[in-house]
């Protein structure tokens, strides 16, 4: 039987970690929101600029999320060591992570630039692709800075500090809006650049992010000590393999998930520019709710990794259940909000009547899959925390590649449901997420039996 008193302390501990991560995650997605809103207003009744940033952002996102996903593997490793008080090994992971993840950022940047010729073969209107490419290039140039920032961010999350990343992201978001205002609209003597100006603003703010967080590390003695522990002797192929072993399944899971969203966005382009813009509005809203879900999932990983490091099964079980309670409550709230305001929200993005009408219908469908999405992300967070990540990728493949995209295509094109059919594919695709709960419960049983 559920008793609030049993979980009160767990809710407080989870929320203490999750709320700053919520602000950080929202801050990251609000970079794209700011670009879309300001470019959408710049375009007025012409949906091309908004469609361009939507398309460019979608293509960028798929490799961006794959790179960032590998860095997420650092958090549970540091969380376990933090609970065990092993500062020396934590410093070694940080040192190797900085080298590995930053080099990975340059690699991802190169891959993103190599994709540019393919953008003309994705079924999008030529004028949309022409406008999207300069914006996309500037986003690609930001990848090394993103990966450098994420190395420090994931380390801090591992030691239970989620506030610093929040402050850095908020400050850089304000910078992004200011730079957008200058470059998109041509203020302070600069040329009016439209969508390209949004890319410049985003690049500038992302360069500032690692500078700020590195400055914090050097300012605080307890974190500077980790940097002072760096030594050429600490570079280790074995350590990098461990980072890759943890990060790669997470990255592939996020890559497949992003592929489903990007694939859906590309198929929207096969319908019309109106569908592209309406989908971007609906997905931007869904992403805002999703980022809060992933924040709860990230906090879950931190709590679970600390409990796992301390080998406290009872605390781990309570923390996991509390995370499920929190995410279910949030997703119910989000779904009700989307349904209530589906006709109002699109008007903040555009004045085009056709886009507003279609976006309001898509927002209703976004509300449908909120609950399953939340349960899936908390389950993934738990499995990351106990370092059981191998199962994550196969289930993601089943969800997004076997179910989501084919069903979306079937409904959207074969059965003629259009944009609404493509979005309904996500509802079907999230069904296999229940297997993640089965895996977590199996791990707990094995741990109780002394197998883990």
Name what the model sees in each region.
Residues 26, 30-51, 119-126, 182-193, ...:
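Helix-terminus/linker motif at the lipid-water interface of multi-pass membrane proteins
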Residues 28, 32-39, 64-71, 75, ...:
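Alpha-helical transmembrane segments and their lipid-water interface positions
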Residues 21, 25, 36-37, 76, ...:
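Transmembrane alpha-helix boundary and packing residues in multipass membrane permease domains
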Residues 1-18, 78-144, 190-248, 304-369, ...:
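Short alpha-helical transmembrane segments in multi-pass integral membrane proteins
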Residues 16-35, 138, 158, 172, ...:
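Transmembrane helical elements of multi-pass membrane transporters/channels
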Residues 50-109, 113, 146-165, 278-342, ...:
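Small-residue-rich hydrophobic transmembrane alpha-helices
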Residues 68-71, 139-157, 165-173, 198-214, ...:
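Short runs within selected transmembrane alpha-helices of multi-pass transporters and secretion channels
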Residues 6-37, 41-45, 58-73, 77, ...:
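N-terminal transmembrane alpha-helices
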């Amino acid at each position: 039987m559920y008793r609030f008193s049993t979980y009160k302390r767990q809710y407080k501990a989870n929320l203490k970690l999750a709320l700053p991560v919520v602000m950080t995650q929202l801050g990251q997605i609000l970079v794209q929101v700011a670009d879309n809103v300001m470019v959408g207003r710049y375009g007025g009744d012409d949906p091309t600029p908004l469609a361009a940033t939507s398309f460019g952002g979608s293509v960028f996102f798929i490799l961006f999320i794959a790179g960032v996903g590998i860095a997420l593997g650092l958090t549970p490793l540091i969380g376990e060591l933090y609970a065990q008080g092993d500062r020396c090994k934590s410093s070694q992971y940080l040192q190797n992570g900085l080298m590995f993840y930053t080099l990975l950022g340059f690699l991802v940047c190169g891959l993103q630039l190599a994709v540019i010729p393919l953008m003309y073969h994705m079924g999008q209107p030529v004028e949309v692709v022409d406008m999207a490419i300069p914006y996309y290039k500037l986003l690609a140039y930001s990848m090394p800075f993103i990966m450098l920032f994420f190395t420090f961010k994931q380390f801090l999350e591992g030691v239970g500090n989620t506030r610093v990343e929040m402050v850095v992201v908020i400050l850089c978001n304000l910078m992004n809006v200011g730079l957008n205002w200058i470059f998109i609209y041509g203020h302070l003597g600069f040329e009016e650049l439209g969508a390209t100006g949004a890319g410049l603003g985003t690049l500038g703010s992302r360069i500032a992010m690692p500078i700020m967080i590195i400055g914090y590390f050097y300012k605080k003695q307890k974190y500077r000590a980790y940097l002072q522990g760096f030594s050429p002797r600490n570079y280790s192929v074995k350590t990098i393999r461990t980072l890759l072993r943890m990060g790669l399944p997470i990255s592939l899971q996020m890559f497949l998930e992003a592929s489903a969203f990007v694939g859906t966005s590309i198929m929207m382009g096969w319908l019309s520019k109106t569908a592209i813009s309406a989908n971007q509005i609906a997905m931007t809203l869904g992403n805002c709710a999703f980022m809060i879900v992933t924040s709860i999932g990230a906090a879950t990983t931190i709590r679970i990794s600390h409990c796992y490091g301390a080998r406290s099964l009872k605390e781990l079980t309570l923390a996991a259940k509390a995370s499920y309670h929190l995410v279910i409550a949030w997703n119910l709230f989000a779904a009700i909000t989307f349904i209530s305001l589906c006709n109002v929200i699109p008007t903040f993005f555009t004045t085009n009547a056709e886009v507003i009408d279609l976006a309001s219908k898509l927002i209703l469908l976004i509300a449908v899959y909120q609950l399953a999405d939340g349960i899936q992300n908390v389950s993934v967070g738990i499995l990351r925390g106990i370092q059981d990540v191998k199962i994550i990728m196969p289930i993601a493949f089943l969800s997004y590649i076997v179910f989501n995209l084919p069903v979306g295509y079937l409904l959207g094109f074969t059965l003629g449901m259009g944009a609404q059919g493509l979005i309904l594919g996500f509802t079907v695709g999230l069904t296999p997420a229940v297997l993640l709960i089965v895996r977590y419960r199996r791990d707990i049983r094995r741990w109780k039996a002394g197998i883990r």
